[in-house]
Regions:
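Divalent metal-coordination and catalytic microenvironments
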Residues: 8, 34, 63-64, 101, ...
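N-terminal active-site segment of His-dependent metallophosphoesterases
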Residues: 1-54, 58
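Residue-level marker for buried hydrophobic side chains located in beta-strands
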Residues: 5, 29-31, 60-61, 114, ...
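Generic beta-strand structural signal
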Residues: 31, 108-110, 232, 254
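Acidic, His/Gly-rich catalytic cores of divalent-metal-dependent hydrolytic chemistry
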Residues: 130-272
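Active-site-proximal beta-strand elements of phosphoester/diester hydrolases
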Residues: 3-10, 113-119, 238-239
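Active-site neighborhood of divalent metal-dependent phosphoester bond hydrolases
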Residues: 43-46, 51-168
């Protein structure tokens, strides 16, 4: 069985269909999050990916844009300029789709590879990453009154401590798994920088290059960082190649790490 890992879709379902048509023997998919927003087919994307997951043909992680959709639907956040989520919010199957998103995992591990949307903090082992991701997953799935969503946003605490509890603990995990790009030498998350790694503030490094990264011997596949684009190293693979910004949509065949790409039309002009 061939498994293909797909970078950020962000509502670009037509581009995915074109990419999928060129993949030989595509039996199963892993989507690294950000299924929705900024592209103009978020509703179709959700419906099709949901069906694939329910038939055992895919695994879909949750990303920051997917969380944003949940927060907007709950009245916790407002739509931003450039958001393309209204068709999901107006859909007759809205509640079913939102409930499905709430139950998406924040991390996945198989065949010796760790999958996340954004990144992993330096002290976290694979086992701890999966355990912390499950803490957030369970809190989000059980958040019937949206209390967790109301407390989820914020940049603090920026550093991990095993002593963190409650919403501070969960917020730190969410930020790491769905938002982080850069870290300071002492492991603090810089959640403001969205540009390339070589444009980072002095001293900050990509999360995957932090010298104390406990997962350095484990391949980690992620999305999220479209400005950095495709990255293919032995222990880290970045797949967000900016489809929604007129870049490419990228697929990684897990078994042999072969890469497949499809050019995408420019749907947005600048990432915010």
């Amino acid at each position: 069985m061939a498994t293909y890992v797909i970078g950020d879709l962000q509502g670009c379902w037509s581009s995915f269909k074109q990419l999928a048509a060129q993949l030989p023997a595509a039996d199963r998919y892993i989507f690294v999050g950000d299924l929705v927003n900024r592209g103009f087919e978020s509703l179709a994307t959700l419906r099709h990916v949901k069906t694939r997951v329910e038939h055992g043909k895919a695994i879909a992680l949750i990303g920051n844009h997917d969380l944003h959709l949940l927060a907007v639907a709950a009245g916790v956040r407002r739509l931003k300029d450039g958001d393309t989520l209204q068709e999901v919010l107006d859909a007759p199957d809205r509640e079913e789709l939102l409930a499905w998103i709430r139950n998406r995992p924040l991390a996945h591990f198989e065949d010796g590879v760790l999958f996340v949307h954004a990144g992993v903090l330096p002290p976290w082992t694979v086992e701890q990453t999966l355990s912390l991701a499950d803490e957030v997953h369970r809190s989000l799935a059980a958040d019937d009154d949206n209390a967790f969503l109301r407390q989820m946003y914020g940049d603090e605490p920026s550093r991990w401590s095993d002593d963190l509890t409650g919403n501070d603990r969960l917020r730190c995990v969410v930020n790491a798994l769905t938002r982080v790009r850069l870290l300071s030498p002492d492991g603090a998350m810089n959640l403001k920088h969205k540009g390339k790694a070589n444009e980072a503030p002095r001293g900050d490094v990509p999360w995957f290059d932090h010298p104390q990264r406990a997962t350095r011997d484990t391949p980690v596949v992620f999305g999220h960082w479209s400005a950095e684009g495709l990255m293919a190293r032995s222990n880290v693979i970045g797949l967000d190649t900016g489809c929604v910004w007129g870049g490419k949509l990228t697929a990684l065949r897990l078994q042999d790490r072969a890469l497949f790409q499809r050019d995408c039309p420019e749907l947005q002009t600048a990432e915010e």
